[in-house]
């Protein structure tokens, strides 16, 4: 009986925090305004997509590679609340003809779930790459053995498309490592990845077991996870790590046990052997120097403070710049209002998105910034190609493009 009472109390506490989180805009939103910054000379286009594009990287000046990840659908079953997620995919966006194509995964095991998120490339030659993909592999047949997998594909560039051939997999138990958030390929054998350990539901069931009671929660941004994440953040229970993995030796090394709670996006500067790791809650970017002799080892050498929340970053070796998609809630707007209070025609806004460009050769100064009311909510990635800036979101369908007028 005491256990049941404890469960009920925990449930009410998490619901209370979730209610405050979801309604904080109502409490604070009337006091703050945000003007759209640096978009007067740009026009935007929203390209419809089948599913949300959770992550995006640049292959070259012609192609973007995107991971399509379906949001969980939440159902009630005879035993507990559970999720079911349809398979996602890898999409190729052709910048020249504005075509978005779902790429076939050659030789990929048909029975293996595919829920891709983070992406990273290693260049073999001008036409051939290894593509590494985070796969949140939810096993509906054996739900207590959910795995986080990193899939390795051989990517070959063709005239108007690419081919992806499945090679092999590195898997991690969710029970011990939590969720893999981002990856960066150092060479063809060494990868770095960030993880986040947090509360998660013990089981997943198929749609055949649905009761329809919680259908209104579909695509609710990991609704149950949000409840527990809020509680864990309040008591500093969430932990994040940075690891390296040697694909050939099968060895894992802990590089950083974060003092904060949000090790997220990774990007690698191969020329200078620098690894960038963003932490949205702490609002900074950690810079590690990768050992040239032992690339599975890294040393923290610098920290850059950021103004906004950043989920993922991309290092553009052609321009020696870092691109970041930014997002924010009502809590960020105090600083924004103070910064832009002299602007005219402020519009009320509850959330915002945007883009930041860091110029590495000028000591990581911000060389371009865009802020806008969310035409696309929950920005997870942003990349600049020539005069166009591309935005993706893991929560909302669509590819948003800002172009010079």
Language model segments and positions:
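A short helix->beta-strand "capping" segment at the edge of beta-propeller domains
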Residues: 26-52, 102-104, 163-167, 364-371
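Beta-rich, blade/repeat-based domains predominating
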Residues: 50-59, 86-87, 108-123, 171-190, ...
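Short, conserved, GDST-rich strand-edge loop motifs in beta-rich repeat architectures
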Residues: 66-85, 133-146, 193-236, 325-350
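Short loop/turn segments that connect beta-strands within beta-propeller blades
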Residues: 94-98, 155-162, 246-250, 289-294, ...
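Asp-box/WD-like beta-propeller blade repeats and closely related beta-sheet repeat scaffolds
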Residues: 104-124, 128-187, 194-229
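Blade-level signature of beta-propeller repeat domains, shared across WD40, Kelch, NHL, RCC1
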Residues: 378-405
């Amino acid at each position: 009986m005491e256990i049941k009472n404890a469960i009920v109390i925990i449930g009410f506490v998490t619901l209370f925090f979730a209610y405050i989180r979801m309604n904080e805009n109502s409490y604070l939103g009337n006091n703050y305004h945000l003007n759209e910054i640096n978009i007067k000379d740009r026009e935007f286009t929203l390209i419809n997509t089948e599913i949300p594009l959770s992550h995006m990287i640049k292959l070259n000046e012609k192609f973007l590679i995107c991971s399509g990840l379906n949001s969980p659908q939440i159902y009630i079953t005879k035993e507990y609340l559970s999720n079911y997620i349809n398979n996602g995919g890898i999409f190729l966006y052709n910048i020249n003809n504005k075509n978005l194509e779902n790429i076939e995964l050659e030789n990929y095991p048909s029975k293996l779930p595919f829920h891709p998120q983070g992406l990273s490339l290693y260049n073999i030659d001008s036409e051939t790459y290894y593509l590494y993909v985070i796969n949140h592999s939810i096993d509906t047949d054996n739900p207590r053995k959910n795995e986080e997998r990193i899939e390795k594909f051989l990517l070959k560039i063709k005239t108007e498309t690419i081919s992806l051939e499945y090679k092999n997999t590195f898997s991690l138990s969710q029970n011990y490592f939590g969720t893999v958030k981002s990856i960066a390929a150092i060479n063809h054998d060494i990868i770095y990845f960030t993880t986040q350990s947090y509360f998660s539901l013990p089981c997943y069931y198929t749609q055949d077991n649905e009761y329809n009671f919680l259908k209104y929660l579909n695509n609710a941004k990991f609704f149950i996870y949000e409840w527990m994440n809020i509680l864990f953040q309040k008591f500093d229970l969430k932990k994040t790590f940075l690891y390296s993995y040697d694909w050939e030796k099968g060895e894992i090394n802990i590089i950083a046990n974060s003092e904060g709670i949000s090790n997220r996006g990774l990007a690698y500067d191969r020329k200078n052997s620098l690894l960038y790791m963003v932490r949205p809650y702490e609002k900074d970017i950690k810079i590690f120097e990768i050992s040239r002799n032992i690339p599975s080892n890294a040393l923290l050498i610098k920290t850059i403070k950021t103004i906004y929340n950043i989920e993922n970053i991309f290092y553009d070796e052609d321009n020696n710049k870092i691109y970041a998609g930014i997002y924010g809630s009502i809590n960020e707007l105090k600083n924004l209002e103070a910064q832009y209070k002299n602007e005219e025609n402020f519009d009320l806004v509850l959330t915002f998105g945007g883009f930041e460009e860091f110029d590495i050769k000028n000591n990581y100064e911000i060389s371009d910034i865009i802020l806008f009311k969310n035409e696309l909510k929950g920005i997870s990635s942003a990349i600049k190609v020539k005069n166009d800036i591309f935005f993706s979101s893991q929560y909302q369908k669509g590819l948003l493009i800002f172009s010079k007028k």
